[in-house]
């Protein structure tokens, strides 16, 4: 039985700020990056589009996702709901725009089915935003807007575009995301001034050879379509900086991709890639490479020539080894994700290969040992995720990992943590859940910066008194162990907001628990020997969630227990010696 004991807080969403033209230009040059995947939301005023992929990894892992299609900004309509505009209202907007000689018109979220032909009179327009309407087609008259530089048509039901758009000789940005296109309209290939083309989330199956007619393209996003191959002519896009082909059906890349030497961001995640061409090594400007969720079994040695590479994501492939010295050659690499592959050993290359790495994710492999000294030069390594491997012990130099901030060793076969864990003085997050730990080292108390400690599903019978020194601790998870008591020092953890004690053998809670003034969540469920609760618990004034399922609590009146956590807290307040204080 769990209960919410607190009051809901009012929250107000701030209106998005209207971006200036200068900000929009700056944003259009930006590319995305690795990060956690998130669900795509309906674009707000900034038109942000950040959906990325299928799965998430653990909270403590380094970045694993890669998204670049998030750079559109547009003027700010009133936030919130879609406006319903009659044809007359739209015409009124068009007339107002003409009379004021405005260069920018935003008709987004108006439920527009048909754009009036009178739009042709707005020849001064440079920006036209029609996001999130119900357009199935555009009138040919849009082709009269010869000064148009930005045309944003995302989230409509377009199946084609009029040929008259080839009159838009100044058009630089075309946004066709979230429509119903089955092919790239032929007129698009004639818009040779385009620098930015968004075609995300349509039903496109092919990219034609005519893509070569768009030599000024610096951003091409065709993610989330049904594309099975790219034409060799993609290599003629020599100004391409960002290429996003994620979530398609590619099995191979054309070797001509190596001609796109200006590319800094290449997102190929969630395809069916079986290999990479050796020419990928020609991408000397490449900064981010996303290859997660493909079918790769090997990485070409030529990738070592991509010396500008900072982020490499190879999650969920069939890779068991990397070319020797590959990582040592990538002298700017700071984020490496090798999770969900077939590694049984660390990559060959010695300590130098991790000298620039800030974040390393090796989750869900078959590694049974971290080599001694492998991180001896890893002076900036802050995040290490070794979750779900086959580790039985930690290396003797474990205590020298002084730069570590987040360490995830969950779901291994560790039976002990070395005493020299005390050397990890920068550690803020330590995840040790689902191991075989029976006790914790006294040196744990030296981790004074620790904010989160997860020890769920081990075999702990007690906690060291030194845990009282972890005064910055906010989250402590001890669920599913064999604890019968807690040290009195638990009361020193005054910053604790979450305390998980479910599925243990607790017989009582120490009265010092009442000093946890910031405690918001307390989980006591499934403690079959817990017959009472201390009156001091009523002093935890911020407690909003308490779980007591399957706890006998026989020392409390049955009718109080039956009422649930809120009744119990009220009882402790009213009957205890602290009633004047709460």
Curated annotation (Swiss-Prot):
Query: What highest taxon heads this organism's lineage?
Result: Eukaryota
Which regions are annotated as LRR repeats? Answer: 101-122, 124-145, 147-169, 170-191, 193-215, 216-237, 239-260, 262-283, 285-307, 308-329, 332-353, 356-377, 380-400, 403-424, 426-448, 449-470, 472-494, 495-516, 518-540, 542-563
Q: Fetch the Pfam families from UniProt.
A: LRR_14, LRR_8
Q: Which region ranges are annotated with the description Disordered?
A: 1-88
Q: Name one GO molecular function term.
A: protein phosphatase 1 binding
Q: What SUPFAM superfamilies does UniProt report for this protein, alphabetically?
A: L domain-like (SSF52058)
Compositionally biased spans, kind Basic and acidic residues:
1-29, 36-57
- Subcellular location per the Swiss-Prot or TrEMBL entry: Cytoplasm; Nucleus
Q: Does the keyword Transport apply?
A: no
Q: Which GO terms describe its biological process?
A: cellular response to growth hormone stimulus; negative regulation of neural precursor cell proliferation; negative regulation of neuron differentiation; nerve growth factor signaling pathway; positive regulation of neuron differentiation; positive regulation of neuron projection development; positive regulation of Ras protein signal transduction; regulation of MAPK cascade
Keywords from UniProt, A to Z, are: Cytoplasm, Leucine-rich repeat, Nucleus, Repeat
* GO CC terms of this entry: cytoplasm; cytosol; nucleoplasm; nucleus; protein phosphatase type 1 complex
Keyword Nucleus: yes or no? yes
Which positions does the motif RVxF motif occupy? 63-66
Please classify the protein's predominant subcellular localization into one broad category.
cytoplasm
Listed PANTHER family: LEUCINE-RICH REPEAT-CONTAINING PROTEIN, PTHR48051
Q: How does it assemble?
A: Component of the SHOC2-MRAS-PP1c (SMP) complex consisting of SHOC2, GTP-bound M-Ras/MRAS and the catalytic subunit of protein phosphatase 1 (either PPP1CA, PPP1CB or PPP1CC). SHOC2 and PP1c preferably bind M-Ras/MRAS, but they also bind K-Ras/KRAS, N-Ras/NRAS and H-Ras/HRAS; these interactions are GTP-dependent and both SHOC2 and PP1c are required to form a stable complex. Interacts with PP1c in the absence of Ras GTPases. Interacts with M-Ras/MRAS and RAF1. Interacts with ERBIN; disrupts the interaction with RAF1 and Ras, preventing the activation of the Ras signaling pathway.
Instruction: Report the protein's function.
Output: Core component of the SHOC2-MRAS-PP1c (SMP) holophosphatase complex that regulates activation of the MAPK pathway. Acts as a scaffolding protein in the SMP complex. The SMP complex specifically dephosphorylates the inhibitory phosphorylation at 'Ser-259' of RAF1 kinase, 'Ser-365' of BRAF kinase and 'Ser-214' of ARAF kinase, stimulating their kinase activities. The SMP complex enhances the dephosphorylation activity and substrate specificity of PP1c.
What family, per the record? Answer: Belongs to the SHOC2 family.
**Entry domain remark:** Contains a N-terminal RVxF motif that is important for interaction with PP1c. PP1c (all isoforms) binds to the concave side of SHOC2, via LRR 2-5, 8-11, and 13-18. M-Ras/MRAS binds to the concave side of SHOC2, via LRR 1-10, 12 and 14-16.
Name of this chain's protein: Leucine-rich repeat protein SHOC-2
Q: Which species expresses this protein natively?
A: Mus musculus (Mouse)
